[in-house]
Amino acid sequence: MIQLKHKLVVVLSIPCVVCCPTWAQQPKDSVRVHDLKVVEVVAFHGSCGITDVVPGSVLNRENIANMGITDIADALHRMPGVNLRDYGGAGGMKTIGVRGFGAQHTGVSYDGFMLSDTQSGSVDVSRYALDNIESLTLSIGGENDVFLSAREVSSAALFRMTTLTERPADHRVHLQTQLKFGSFGYVSPFVYYVQSVSNRVTLSANGEYIYAENDYPFTLRNGIYKTHGRRNNSRMNSGHGELNAYVSTGKYGEIDGKVYYYDNSRLLPGIAKYYSDINGESLHDRNGFAQFGWRQHAANGLWSWKAKGKFNWSSSRYRDKYSPNHIMDADYWQREAYGSLAAMFTPTDGLSFAFASDYVFNNLNSSLATDVRPFRHTLLESFSVKYVTPRLVLLGRALYSVYLNGAERGEAAKNGRKLSPSFSLSYRPFSSEQFYIRTSYKNIFRAPTFNENYFFHFGSPRLKPETTDQLNLGVTWQKQFSNRFNLEITADGYLNHIKDKIVAIPYNMFIWTNVNIGRVQSKGVEVSLRGDYQLAEKHNLLFFGGYSYQNVTDREDKSLPDYGKQIAYIPLHSVSGSVKWGNPWVDIVIHGAGYGSRWASNSHYDGTRLAGYFDMGLTCSHRFVMKHGEFSLRGDIKNILNQQYEIVGNYPMPGISYQFVVNYKF
């Protein structure tokens, strides 16, 4: 037992010896290896991706509970390489960047369909409820699955949200009801319904409402002086609902559909500044979409096919009651139509070929007099091949992209087309050890957003796409030391380049415009550790630790003062970790995430340095199993050290707060 304590001290110290956080690396296993021992090991407690050919992370519902995760933003803090932009509070926008790439380079999918915002290019993940999530998956520099739509492989990284997919064996109604309440006026009811109405048809629905005042206190510091304030104009009313249907078309086929609606009316607090806390901004976001999917497999297993279709509509209504003559008020509307066809051919065990063809149409219009009403046609085609043996996995892919731009009232952006290759490999050098070496390369680009192309004065229709190159080399290792102790470790090093980076420069004294001048280099290391130890019957420890080093610098021109400086909002070091004690009475989780210092500007101006911080939390929970259902209670204390910090400059985050969750399902 003494020896065990020493081991645990070493493990739990990993998140504490570095000055900031990272996240667990646990990609989803989509590789079907014939060595049964490999499959068993990878399934252990949600793997760190021992056999995956690309780095990433997977969190399933069990992981989410074991790590004390409270929302999707909290989950992203636990994933290595992620840079989350968070504007604070329950209603603050939250977007994802990965390994120094901006949010525009990170694709986000919801049940296999890509989410999009062609106006800004970034997706706000705070819109989606963690309570409805089955798993969260982050893949960096490629995908492990060969049978994907072309759009799913068109980003530098992909964050996938998969919702609950229960299909009850009986035909009775199954319900889950939940109530969350917490600090700063936070209350959120959630309800989930699922029923197998026949042997082939399953229906489900869920809905969530969130109300929060978000009036948390904060402190402003100016030299030796401190001012205490409280966030105002920060109220949020948000709700969303979904209807889902699943139909089995026989032994080898299935159809699924989803209808989704989201509505969020919120006040915007603006930046925190001295001597004035007056702000009159508000934003009303609405989003609705319908999507449909079909999958079919041949009886002989040689062929598989799938088709997807989606229509998406969204609107944003911005108001500022203090702007002169309401000149800042604006309304925006976006529409998207999407279709995809894909086929996979598996001539023999271990060898697969896949082809996918996607079409996307996007347009945008607004209430502004300067609106040019832009639209875009996108054609994507991908060809993939995957070869698998018990010790070797090879995956190659080529993506051909065509972007055709137009504008009804002005100059259209430049059209573009490009061929983007990628390659990944995983090799197991010793058959007696669960030790793997992996490497991957991906070339990809992103088209300019509508804001970058068309926003009045600021946009430029002559922009070229940003092109990225990603190179990764890593090792993974898993060891079962006894029937009581398991350990998984992954370590990856990477080198990324971005060219033709889109940056804003002053056109004259009053007007800024977007141009392609930037070059950025990103190099770093990610390490994650996960394990469990059986202390005694019904008593176990689950632990996780992660570290990330990200050196992301300007490489455009050595003669310029910004050359070699760390890019804004990216910490050099970050760590995260959690420990859960599972027991028959009350499960306890201690978790934390920390960042080193960052800069709020690429030029590192005086006064733009953001101090590092460590955010620590405590979760206690218990589940009561009853004859006809299950009842659970959970309590969370967030930022238990009451640290004052900012993720985005001048947007203070909440200090210590609490949240209680009551859940009943039957």
Where do the protein language model's features map onto the residues?
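Surface-exposed extracellular loop regions of Gram-negative outer-membrane beta-barrel proteins
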Residues: 402-409, 413-416, 427-472, 489, ...
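Gram-negative outer-membrane beta-barrel transporters
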Residues: 349, 391-394, 492-497, 516-601, ...
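N-terminal periplasmic "start-of-domain" segments of outer-membrane beta-barrel proteins
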Residues: 35-65
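Flexible loop and strand-edge segments within Gram-negative outer membrane beta-barrel domains
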Residues: 214-218, 228-241, 246-305, 311-336, ...
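Extracytoplasmic beta-strand/coil segments of soluble accessory domains associated
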Residues: 73-114
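Membrane-embedded beta-barrel scaffold of Gram-negative outer-membrane proteins
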Residues: 302-318, 437-440, 466-523, 528-532, ...
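C-terminal beta-signal and adjacent terminal beta-strands/loops
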Residues: 543, 594-601, 609-611, 619-666
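A beta-strand signature from Gram-negative outer-membrane beta-barrel systems
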Residues: 130-176
